[in-house]
């Protein structure tokens, strides 16, 4: 019986050592607690998917959300970034930040853009920063429209 408990403890310890730790820091305009919970729930789903392909055990993500596009443009100008007018969100790999330029009027669509941009960060983690565009955008589109 002791051997059984010893083996069980060893298995549990090994499982803990391989657990994903994801820290997300929020910047910009505040999100509601409900929005944060939804984002973190979907992010956990994304992490479980990407973990199958060698996602690092510890990740730090930065999400910056702006309610007004004008505020986002002023912020991005500091980094000499000038997005196209049709862009609602972007992932900037050199800053490792997902930036939402303006909140969508429709709640779910706005969250979808966030899921899309966070997916870019995770894809870059498993491909050493050089994914084919079709692969990067394909996964981001998939997660943008996922219902968890």
Predicted regions and their residues:
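Sec-dependent N-terminal signal peptides
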Residues: 3-13
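Alpha-helix boundary/capping residues
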Residues: 11, 46, 79, 146-147
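Proteins with a high burden of low-complexity, intrinsically disordered sequence enriched in S/T/G/P/A and R
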Residues: 14, 51, 147-148
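Sec/Tat signal peptide C-region and signal peptidase I cleavage site
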Residues: 15-19
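Juxtacatalytic substrate-recognition/specificity segment
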Residues: 20-132
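Post-HExxH zinc-binding segment in Zn-dependent metallohydrolases
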Residues: 130-148
